[in-house]
Regions:
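ATP/NTP phosphate-donor binding region
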Residues: 1-93
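Short glycine/serine/threonine-rich phosphate/pyrophosphate-binding segments
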Residues: 20-23, 45-48, 76-79, 101-106, ...
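Glycine/threonine-rich beta-strand-loop-alpha-helix active-site module
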Residues: 77-181
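Glycine-rich phosphate/pyrophosphate-binding beta-alpha loops
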Residues: 144, 251-284, 370-374
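Carboxylate- and glycine-rich phosphate/diphosphate-binding segment that chelates Mg2+/Mn2+
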Residues: 152-260
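Flexible, glycine/charged-enriched surface loops at secondary-structure junctions
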Residues: 210-218, 233-245, 260-265, 318-322, ...
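Mobile late-domain/C-terminal helix-loop "cap" segments
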Residues: 289-394
Length: 394
């Protein structure tokens, strides 16, 4: 751990049942009068966008419009079209209702509508934003990305096909709403994948080189909430308390990794997802125990501490101290087996349908250049990365 650290997360959380009903007054207190509601067609079809628009109208903050033309892999062209419409409607704020793509799109739209200009790429990279942006409220409909409390947005450049990062503390939303009604209808396979994404955020934040006491506390609580709620929600998907626990776990993990970063699981997962077009949470689930085992013994003390939030006090106390690191990895494998049996969340690349073994070298070559490797406690060269990929194959 670094001798110096800083921690920053100014996002105000509105959490619990009826949290949605608090949003209008909170947004109005930020000076919002005419918000544009951004979502995607899938979320809009569930009626959640209409529900949110009605709640805002009842709070005397009607939306100017609902824009649902946001694809799963949003682009600069999409952002620039929305920014143009925002200006035409004379909007002054944004509400993002959806998952990671919708939230990242809203952050990017907020760049253009606050900073000016028509070309999003003018603001790419880090440190290009020079002042606070207009009010942005994020209402997640999945519990996994933690994007509601991160200072990053990733948008595809349509011209080159590459994914472009935008990084600034000014990208953080002012408000985030965690209301269990918003995730009750989430299919169980997506619930499981996004929860394992959040679990990986928390664990990698806790074992990485940039960890600090504040992010540690958040990460441990995130692991506890996710490990407790996820196996139960498979059998009780409408349970509001369990849905809220997963949402809280995702947000806590987002706060942790936004300040402490992620590691090798993400480096491999980013690369597999990009090459084989697999969902991010699925990729995290594939690699998590394999990478934790690789990182031993450098992270054994952290792995031992993770056993308590993963399995509870009784099993933790019954496990000899020298066996706790291994028991943590076993507990994660057991959770993955449970999810495979319940919703067929793949544990290996072959279960995920990756049939061409020659792709492993391509995935390795992408992973070796991923920035997340910088925060992993144990270095990995090309040969070691290929070995890890082969272990995750079957």
């Amino acid at each position: 751990m670094s001798r110096y650290y800083d921690f920053f997360c100014p996002v105000k959380l509105l959490a619990g049942e009826q949290a949605l009903e608090q949003l209008a007054s909170e947004l109005a207190s930020l000076g919002a009068c005419r918000p544009l509601l951004l979502t995607d067609k899938g979320v809009n079809a569930t009626g959640l966008a209409t529900l949110l628009a009605n709640v805002l109208a009842e709070g005397e903050l009607p939306v100017a419009a609902i824009w649902d033309e946001i694809p799963a892999d949003s682009s600069t062209a999409v952002v620039e079209r929305i920014a143009k419409r925002y200006r035409e409607l004379d909007c002054d704020s944004l509400v993002a209702l959806g998952g990671g793509s919708v939230i990242d799109t809203a952050k990017a739209v907020n760049i253009l509508t606050s900073m000016g200009g028509d070309h999003l790429l003018d603001y790419s990279g880090a440190g290009c934003l020079t002042r606070p942006l207009k009010p942005l409220a994020v209402v997640p409909t999945t519990a996994g990305t933690g994007s509601e409390v991160t200072l990053v947005a990733v948008i595809k450049d349509e011209a080159s096909g590459r994914k472009v990062p935008f990084t600034s503390p000014f990208l953080l939303p002012q408000l985030a709403v965690l209301d269990p009604r918003l995730t009750q209808g989430l299919p169980l396979n997506i619930t499981a994948a996004t929860a394992m994404d959040a679990m990986t955020h928390a664990i990698e934040a806790f074992i990485g080189t940039a960890k600090n006491p504040v992010s540690d506390a958040l990460a441990l609580m995130a692991v506890e909430k996710i490990a407790s709620a996820l196996p139960q929600i498979i059998h009780d998907p409408q349970n509001k308390q369990l849905r809220l626990q997963l949402a809280e776990g995702s947000t806590l993990a987002g706060m942790a990794f936004s300040n402490s970063m992620v590691g090798l699981v993400h480096a491999l997962g980013h690369s597999l997802g990009a090459r084989c077009h697999l969902p991010h949470g699925l990729c995290m689930n594939l690699f998590l125990p394999t990478v934790l085992d690789y990182n031993r013994p450098e992270v054994d003390s952290e792995l031992a501490r993770l056993l308590l939030p993963l399995v509870g006090a009784e099993r933790f106390a019954a496990t000899p101290a020298h066996q706790r690191a291994e028991a943590t990895i076993t507990a994660i494998r057991t959770l993955r087996d449970t999810l495979w049996q319940a919703v067929k969340l793949p544990r290996t690349m072959s279960e995920a349908g990756v049939s061409d073994r020659s792709l492993l070298t391509e995935i390795r070559d992408l992973a070796i250049n991923d920035g997340a490797l910088l925060f992993n406690r144990k270095d990995a060269n090309r040969e070691q990365l290929l070995t890890l990929l082969e272990r995750a194959w079957a």
